[in-house]
Amino acid sequence: MKIQDFQDNVTCGGFDNIFANIYKPQDIESQKSRYMSAVEKFTALYPNRNDIHVYSAPGRTEIGGNHTDHQHGCVIAGAVDLDVIGVAAFHDENIIRIKSEGYDEFAVSLDDLDVHIGEKGSSEIVRGIAARFKDLGVEISGFDMYTTSNVLGGSGISSSAAFETLIATAIDSYYNNNPVSYTHLTLPTIR
């Protein structure tokens, strides 16, 4: 979707049903402002990108079994209305560039998806997800993305999992037409 079309739809209520499925009614106007701000920041960072895709991935609360999933146990989780949103433009430059609000931009070359000893954080997550899609036979050619999150890191509502879900959703929806289950995707990305 063109940036101006996205902004017009947000302003004129064209996405209100989508916002109503994600957020509480009293939060829709503030969320619309949040999305508009994210698109503006994306445009400032990547001024030559005009076709965008916008994604949301929720945080989660673990009701039972907290952290047992890290040892292949089971957990009962529920989504919360805090999320990370991403504005992305896909391209054929064979690189993923991501700028998250409050953090420096980083890049992951799709020509180098091997494990990097000592690499930690978001670039490690993105590299692992891209490697998993490659292992599944999905051709990825790259994208630029701006993210903003109200899922606070270290708060116990899975900010890293929300970021991972956001990236996997963007890749899966654009390059793979959504056929992969998240369980199938995320477990092997932990390398």
Regions found by a protein language model. Give the residues of each.
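Conserved small/polar residues in nucleotide/adenosyl-binding loops
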Residues: 183-189
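ATP-binding N-lobe of GHMP and related small-molecule kinases
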Residues: 2-161, 165-180
